[in-house]
């Protein structure tokens, strides 16, 4: 078999007159009575092949048996297309190949999905036949971008003298974070490894080991409830460095991301990226990952509410809550009462008891709550919300977390419905100065806002023992277009500070020693100050490739129920395997 001389999508007018050897899949076959045209596809694109009896009767006879997705080896001569046959929508649209020989390398059954970007197959069918779905050009282009992003990051970190180091996949289960995936040990009866949720502890230990600059394209595993932008196994760009300040880490990541955007996406973004404190992000956008491509910020009306005539507003503030509103500019005529009822139900999903609203008309405020406000109060509302005739004002009165969650989500929904978002923009943002701890009322304890190894501000270390809720973290998240790309922090590197952190999280001294004794001991041998960041590769590629589903950026992803439709994993295992692991199943009864 002759070697391939050209990729299908790379045959251009420069090759006219040449004999070429092509190999690929049949995208489409057209029989025009005496002539057969085949679109031959490989990962670079499509070229038109013509089977003409005047060129080769034998090749034409074979072509008559060919169907879509057959794998072919074609030999032929490149010729220019006639004027009326030129297709400027194809890179190869000015030429075609006159086939002299064709060899069917493999036949194909009729495929269960259409191999085209506009396939009508459901996602379940696409996942079951993922190897066919991956043939679609849009899928290949997504994974080409993933490769380009990873390559650019590796090259950048190499120039910055980072070492790529692999850390263990079989490790120890720790109590913080999401549920672990557990792996039973055959050698140690009744004991389990855990698959890593991140390489956090190992990368810190590499800093203890004097490596100074580490990175890894790391596989991570979390047994958590899934959604469109979550998978049980995912990939993160894991980075750690010694002796760098927070500003130095952020500046380096900005240089890396501007290079990724330019090299992998062809888009110039400017640095430094804007920075916003966590408290400001929550106050202005109701989100710790604000989408700054459009405005519509939350406005605090709590002071106004104290003296207003609407008791719902007044009582919310008196009970320690707040009143906030958003102004959907020019949207009054676009939302009927029924539409606003739908927005109300949407807000309730996020804990709001209801959604108050007003429409601004030329002669004043209209709506169910307009009667509660006199002329002076109406003017204050209009001024605070920068309202004009035609605007729709939406209010939530509740505890602070509910106000932020509901109005933040409502803001995003309205941004999409009103087409306020410029989809061509890439808005990066650093969210800094996070709270170190978050209190969970159900569990009646504090949890780490990021993880238990995050360094507090130096002046806040003592607050861990006196007022943990006031302690701030030297932590930072990188946000792109309303998605958290990744998070990082400076790390605790002194044993006494780490022990205070564990105590604030409710660990007894014995529990801390049992779970993290190896780390605490490491901190006694001259641990350098260090910090880092982990960026979600799957999510970054999703945003750059313009996909809406994380599964489209992972070659063989899981469904929302964490199953693989292709291999049918997870699956039962043989009784003998369980016995070898000293395991016995106790299945939950179906309700």
UniProtKB/Swiss-Prot annotation:
One of its GO terms (cellular component) is cytoplasm. It is found in: Cytoplasm. L-aspartate binds at residues 176, 222, 450, 491. Residues 200-203 are annotated as: Aspartate. It is an enzyme of class 6 (ligase). It catalyses: tRNA(Asx) + L-aspartate + ATP = L-aspartyl-tRNA(Asx) + AMP + diphosphate. GO terms for molecular function: aspartate-tRNA ligase activity; aspartate-tRNA(Asn) ligase activity; ATP binding; catalytic activity, acting on a protein; nucleic acid binding; transferase activity. Its EC number is 6.1.1.23. GO terms for biological process: aspartyl-tRNA aminoacylation. Keywords: Aminoacyl-tRNA synthetase, ATP-binding, Cytoplasm, Ligase, Nucleotide-binding, Protein biosynthesis. Homodimer. Belongs to the class-II aminoacyl-tRNA synthetase family. Type 1 subfamily. Aspartyl-tRNA synthetase with relaxed tRNA specificity since it is able to aspartylate not only its cognate tRNA(Asp) but also tRNA(Asn). Reaction proceeds in two steps: L-aspartate is first activated by ATP to form Asp-AMP and then transferred to the acceptor end of tRNA(Asp/Asn). NCBIfam families: aspS_bact (TIGR00459), PRK00476.1 (NF001750). This is Aspartate--tRNA(Asp/Asn) ligase.
């Amino acid at each position: 078999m002759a070697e391939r001389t050209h990729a299908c999508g790379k045959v251009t007018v420069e090759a006219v007159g040449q004999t070429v050897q092509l190999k690929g899949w049949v995208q489409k076959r057209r029989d025009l009575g005496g002539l057969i045209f085949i679109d031959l596809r490989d990962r670079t694109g499509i070229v038109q092949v013509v089977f003409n009896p005047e060129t080769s009767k034998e090749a034409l006879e074979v072509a008559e048996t060919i169907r879509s997705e057959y794998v072919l080896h074609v030999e032929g001569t490149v010729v220019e297309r006639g004027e009326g046959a030129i297709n400027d929508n194809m890179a190869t649209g000015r030429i075609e190949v006159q086939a002299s020989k064709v060899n069917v390398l493999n036949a194909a059954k009729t495929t269960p999905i259409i191999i085209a970007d506009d396939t009508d197959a459901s996602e379940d069918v696409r996942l079951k036949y993922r190897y066919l779905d991956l043939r679609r050009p849009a899928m290949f282009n997504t994974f080409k971008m993933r490769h380009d992003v990873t390559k650019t990051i590796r090259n950048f970190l190499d120039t910055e003298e980072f070492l790529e180091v692999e850390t263990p996949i079989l490790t120890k289960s720790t109590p913080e974070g999401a549920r672990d995936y557990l792996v039973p040990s055959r050698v140690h009866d009744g004991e389990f490894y855990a698959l890593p949720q991140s390489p956090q502890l190992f990368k810190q230990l590499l800093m203890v080991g004097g490596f100074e600059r580490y990175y890894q394209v790391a596989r991570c595993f979390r047994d958590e409830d899934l959604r469109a932008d979550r998978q049980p196994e995912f990939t993160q760009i894991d980075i750690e460095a010694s002796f760098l300040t927070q500003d130095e880490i952020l500046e380096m990541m900005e240089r890396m991301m501007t290079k990724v955007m330019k090299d992998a996406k062809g888009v110039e973004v400017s640095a430094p990226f804007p920075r916003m404190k966590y408290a400001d992000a929550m106050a202005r956008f109701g989100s710790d990952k604000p989408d700054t491509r459009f405005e519509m910020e939350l406005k605090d009306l709590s002071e106004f509410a104290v003296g207003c005539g609407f008791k719902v507003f007044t009582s919310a503030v008196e009970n320690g809550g707040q009143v906030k509103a958003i102004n959907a500019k020019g949207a009054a005529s676009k939302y009927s009462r029924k539409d606003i009822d739908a927005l109300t139900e949407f807000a309730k999903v996020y804990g709001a008891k209801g959604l108050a609203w007003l429409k601004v008309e030329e002669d004043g405020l209209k709506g169910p709550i307009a009667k509660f406000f006199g002329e002076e109060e109406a003017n204050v509302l209009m001024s605070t919300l920068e309202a004009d005739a035609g605007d729709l004002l939406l209010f939530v009165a509740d505890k602070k977390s509910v106000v932020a969650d509901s109005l933040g989500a409502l803001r995003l929904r309205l941004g999409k419905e009103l087409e306020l978002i410029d989809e061509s923009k890439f808005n990066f943002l650093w969210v800094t100065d996070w709270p170190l701890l978050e209190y969970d009322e159900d569990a009646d304890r504090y949890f780490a806002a990021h993880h238990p190894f995050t360094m507090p501000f130096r002046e806040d270390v003592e607050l861990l023992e006196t007022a943990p809720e006031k302690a701030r973290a030297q932590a930072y998240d990188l946000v792109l277009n309303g998605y958290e790309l990744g998070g990082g922090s400076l790390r605790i590197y002194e044993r006494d500070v780490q022990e205070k952190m564990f105590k604030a999280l409710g660990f007894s001294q014995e529990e801390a020693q049992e779970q993290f004794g190896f780390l605490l001991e490491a901190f006694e041998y001259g641990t350098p100050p260090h910090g880092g960041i982990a960026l979600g590769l799957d999510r970054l590629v999703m945003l750059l490739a313009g996909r809406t589903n994380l599964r489209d950026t992972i070659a063989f992803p899981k469904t929302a129920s964490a199953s693989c439709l292709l291999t049918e994993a997870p699956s039962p295992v043989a009784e003998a395997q369980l016995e070898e692991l000293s395991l016995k199943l106790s299945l939950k009864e179906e309700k």
